Amino acid sequence: MIASRGAPELPVRLVADYVVPCEGQGRIIPGGAVDIDTKGRISAVGAASELGPGPAPTVTGGLLMPGLINTHAHTPMTLVRSVGDGLPLDRWLKEAVWPLEMRMTPDDVRWAMALGSVEMLLAGVTTSCEMYLHEEAVVEGVAQTGARLVITPGVIAGLAPGGNVEPRVDEIAAFHAAHHAPDRRVSVGFAPHSIYDLSPAQCGEIAARAQAAGALFHIHLEETLAEREQVIATWGAPATRLLADVGALDGPVLAAHGVWLDGVDRRLLAKAGASVAHCPQSNLKLGSGIAPVGDLLGDGVNVAVGTDGPASNDDLDLWEEVRLAALLARGSTHDPEAMSATVALDLATRRAATALHLDDVGELRAGAWADLIRLDLDVPAFTPHRLETLITQLVFAGAARYVTDVWVAGKRVVADRAIATVDVAKLMAECDRRAASLREA
């Protein structure tokens, strides 16, 4: 556990060569410091020389910034990592992924979620938004590692007897009442799979339950052109307009992918205050397309990044998504100014927190949770580095391998590049065994 590694008692002061608060302005504090109080929240951020007396520094050098936030993941798919390569989305799901996932037990999900959570923490990802089944096991898996979790249990009509999802929605409502506890690192939402799996009316009913609970409504939206065409053929309108018609956009909404959204769709999402989770690697690997991120941002839609599942990515390194989001925004428009490095970094920090309706993560500021990471800058990829280019270097050279330390709510869960909470070798061995059993079943 963390304490066994000699983690210092709170309060603590972390001092770094640079602090990047990620407030949206690209501000960098040279010789910065972050104070963490006894409750695991940030009490002060600024130049170390200006903060006044405080605890002796426990970390010095490098760069401190907020922990990254993965806004769309199916992390327990670590057990089916890389299956079905080369198949389009529909066949990939039906032929390769779902048959294996349907054999996964809650114990499988618990181990697989813990494995993915470790992978993310080592990459500096402190929060993930999970759309998955066996939600109790997902919570238990993350509890072992010390990460922050937004769990949005899935609703899939194809798994419900006769397509009746009402009992499942009742389960999720009860789960929300029992487990939604942001102060204990767990937030709960509702996740209808998609409007091509569920009817518009069902999506509206699920959204109403989410809105009544003040919870996030998390749905796959316009991931492929085939999906868009199918929904129009079946229901007479694109998915976003159907969701608006049934009131599904009237509360907190997170739409995953958004690759084929048109101008009307984007304006509806913007008016509703909805967010889009952009998953560029998964969309490219599955041949789904490239989301119009520049148009989304231009129309006022909040955009963040996610990895999607490790079966379609195939890792959980969010730095890759940040970099690819910026590259695709520029390359697809032939405009090197289409997305600045500051905006790209925001997609995994401040904007990601907004997407998940988490008010106290994603920035380093007084009162926020002390979810933060340290990067080693004493490496070739960051040499030379200058104040005026540092954000650009974070976006285009940043990677999991440069993350040395990670704190969640003030607890140091990664220390000197090692997980401080679980036995990683045992975890990997058990997941290897369980993955082999799934394939052989």
Residue positions per predicted region:
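Active-site microenvironment of metallo-dependent hydrolases
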Residues: 1-32, 36-41, 346-441
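Active-site gating loops and adjacent loop-to-helix segments of metal-dependent hydrolytic enzymes
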Residues: 79-111, 118, 145-166, 224-252, ...
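His/Asp/Glu-enriched, well-ordered alpha-helical/loop segment
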Residues: 245-252, 294-379
